[in-house]
Amino acid sequence: MSAYVSAFELFSIGVGPSSSHTVGPMRAARDFAARLRDTGLIARVGRVTGTLYGSLGATGIGHGTPDAVVAGLRGQDPATVDPDAVRRAWSDWPGGALLVAGEREVPFAKDDIVFAPRTRLPGHPNAMTLVALDTDGRTLAEETYFSIGGGFIRREGEEVRVAAQQFPLVFDTAEELLAVCDEQGLTIAEAARRNEEALRSEAEVAAGLDEIWDAMARCIEAGLAADGELPGMLRVKRRAGSIRQQLEDAEATGRRELPGEWLGAFALAVNEENASGGRVVTAPTNGAAGILPAVAMYWWRFLADSGLGVGNAVTPHGELVGSALLGFAARQQLGPVVPDVAADGAALDRVAPDVALDGVRLDEAVLDEAAVAEANRRRGIRRFLLTATALGSLFKANASISGAEGGCQAEVGSACAMAAGGLTAVMGGTNRQIENAAEIAMEHHLGLTCDPVGGLVQIPCIERNAIAASTAVTAARLALRGDGSHYVSLDAVVETMRQTGIDMSTKYKETSEGGLAVNVIEC
């Protein structure tokens, strides 16, 4: 069994405000509805009910869980559904019939979804049971699902299926990951790419990573353009848009020392979009979704063309590192780049001057410096995401990425470590510097509680992402100033996070029963 989780599962496009409380339950309800349809039972269904246990029951209303369940029972997919179709789907339920799986109308009332916050099932703190009854009230089907963090779900009685044979490079710990990379002569990103290409073609991997990044970038743009208040009784005001305006005004006067402030604005933008139920990418969760995109955008906007890397090199496997990756001296390092030459429209990931396309040598093509810069950035983001995927897989396999299971250390701490490692990679860091950066970032989030005020993913979640984004950058810079050797290993920190999560009171694990949630007055 391998710890590795595909980037296309770890970074999933969905809706806010929570991966474990919105995306996961929607997927579970959708799976239940699909099973009714596929088994033919749907023709006999007269009613569908659901029970939300533990953390899902405690903070479900603030996290939009019942709304997500209704959307999932309709057959809607979090990756493609219009976010407006999910918002308040249960909260503003007018009564009448629910179209299950898009096929059968059954009577539905708001109290068909029951909240049981004091009941915790042994499988996971985030549990829900869905029941289909016939017209006489007899049970036709019943399934219990666990939303295990990051939008991942598991059906009761179903083992977590991780087929090691599908991945050529198998590792369960950071130590094993580094050993595999040493043995194969790979960067961490290249190791992840090898595993991804066991499932998809090289072009499909590149295009898929680009799609993930584009969704992240659109989320940042949407958050920076929005204003007003976020949903819920706290009436929290959006700030990303006003900060953007202030920063743009400052830049217009000639101030240029603003990258760190933009970093915070990027993170706020994502998490404000998430809190509003908008389109967001799990990274690795929704509650921590602003950290990695903010750090990646910080690199894209302020560092990608600066040449701030370590050395200029191409690995034996063709991946650019250091300044070559960052676009420094791109004319000499890369030669011409011809966009959109691949069959699927994706730009080539590796360009050799003697390659001919349609009889024309690339070194005879007209150099498009803007295309070179764009291609370099795209390569960098793919490297960033692949590195983060390998690191995030370790947290998911050996500890947790669920706030209901491990507190906020599991969500924000993991995301911060992934972002720190990704940034270190695109800044030309070695594998051991990457591991060091991830360790630094996680170490200083140990013990962090998940205590959302009012059960909403707003306070302290939104600001916390901005602070963690800054921490990720600091961790990367510290690691890059070292040689990769350090006293505390990433594996030791992952295990410490796991143990701390076990010891942590449930009051501090996404139940809103302790911490800020009981000391801040809801107005």
Task: Enumerate the language-model features and the residues they cover.
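Functionally critical mobile loop/hinge segments
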Residues: 52, 414-416, 421-523
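Accessory "access/gating" subregions that flank catalytic or transport cores
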Residues: 203-309, 371-403, 407, 498, ...
